[in-house]
Swiss-Prot record:
InterPro entries: BP-dependent_transpt_permease (IPR050366), MetI-like (IPR000515), MetI-like_sf (IPR035906), OppC_N (IPR025966). Residues 101-290 form the ABC transmembrane type-1 domain. It comes from Escherichia coli (strain K12). One of its GO terms (molecular function) is dipeptide transmembrane transporter activity. It is a multi-pass membrane protein. This is Glutathione transport system permease protein GsiD. The gene is gsiD. GO terms for cellular component: ATP-binding cassette (ABC) transporter complex, substrate-binding subunit-containing; membrane; plasma membrane.
Length: 303
């Protein structure tokens, strides 16, 4: 017995002590994988900077984006006084791009948030209950998927009228089926797991199973898709504004700025270059961030 206790104590002494701060939580594992992706980290920093700029745009902008007019420098290019130049009405393009970030980013995020909320609910119901719930919801999604997203958005705005609020609604509508299908697929897989059967066996209600067990299992997929969908929504909102169906002049929305710049593209290309560059960099950043989140949350599908 003494020999046994001695050996047991020797084994315990040989085991390394694990301090509380050395315990690897899922969050630590996620952060460890994510910070190794330099492109995703750069994109994340850009998105954070963009959000800060959007929040404080009215205070950061050196000039009033809508009511400042420099009639002595119409269509002039970039200078120390006007970093991005001046448009045909004498407005400072740098100030308008900054304030446009506030409008374009808000439109993209709110549209995706609405689409994600409704789509997630429909996907949970379709995947969990199946039967006629599944058939009804999926047939509606099939109908919405039958139309190109921008065409569907144009139709919705044509009915509701122009304006940034209606653009958000239109973009949200064609985001709903994408989230519904994503969540439905995850729900169909999760509902077959043993922990779901265990929850049912102890009398958990359908609402409890959906909200406490199935929904948390779909969060990572939703977050990744949400991030990547923001870029698509920003492009869609800008496209509608470019067509004259979204934000109306003098609102400094990026798509509306491109629409106003069409007449001066030849003599003052900078008027269109900077809003277009803002759209490009923002969409690229959200896509790279989404890729990085996907690889960090589920390293098995990397590559």
């Amino acid at each position: 017995m003494r020999l046994f206790n001695w050996r047991r104590q020797a084994v315990l002494n040989a085991m390394p002590l694990v301090k509380p701060d050395q315990v690897r939580t899922p969050w630590h594992e996620f952060w460890r994988r994510f910070r190794r992706q330099h492109m995703a980290m750069t994109a994340a920093l850009f998105v954070i900077l963009l959000i800060v700029v959007a929040i404080f745009a009215r205070w950061i902008a050196p000039y009033d984006a809508e009511n400042y007019f420099d009639y002595d420098n119409l269509n002039n290019g970039p200078s120390l006084q006007h970093w991005f130049g001046v448009d045909s009405l004498g407005r400072d393009i740098f100030s308008r791009v900054l304030v446009g970030a506030q409008i374009s980013l808000a439109a993209g995020v709110f549209a995706v948030f609405i689409g994600a909320a409704i789509g997630t609910l429909l996907g949970l119901l379709a995947g969990y209950y199946e039967g006629w719930w599944d058939r009804l919801i999926m047939r509606i999604c099939d109908v919405l998927f039958a139309f190109p997203g921008i065409l569907l958005a144009i139709a919705v705005v044509a009915v509701l009228g122009s304006g940034i609020a209606n653009v958000i609604i239109a973009v949200a509508i064609f985001s709903i089926p994408a989230f519904a299908r994503l969540v439905r697929g995850n729900t169909l897989v999760l509902k077959q797991q043993t922990f779901i059967e265990s929850a049912r066996s102890i009398g958990a209600s359908d609402m409890t199973v959906l909200l406490r067990h199935i929904l948390p299992g779909t969060v990572s997929s939703i977050v990744v898709f949400f991030t990547m969908r923001i870029g698509t929504s920003i492009i869609s909102a800008a496209s509608l504004s470019f067509l004259g169906l979204g934000a109306q002049p003098p609102t400094p929305e990026w798509g509306a700025m491109l629409n106003e710049a069409r007449a001066d593209m030849v003599i003052a290309p900078h008027v269109a270059v900077f809003p277009a560059l803002a759209i490009f960099l923002t969409v690229l950043a959200f896509n790279l961030l989404g890729d990085g989140l996907r690889d960090a949350l589920d390293p098995k599908i990397k590559g």
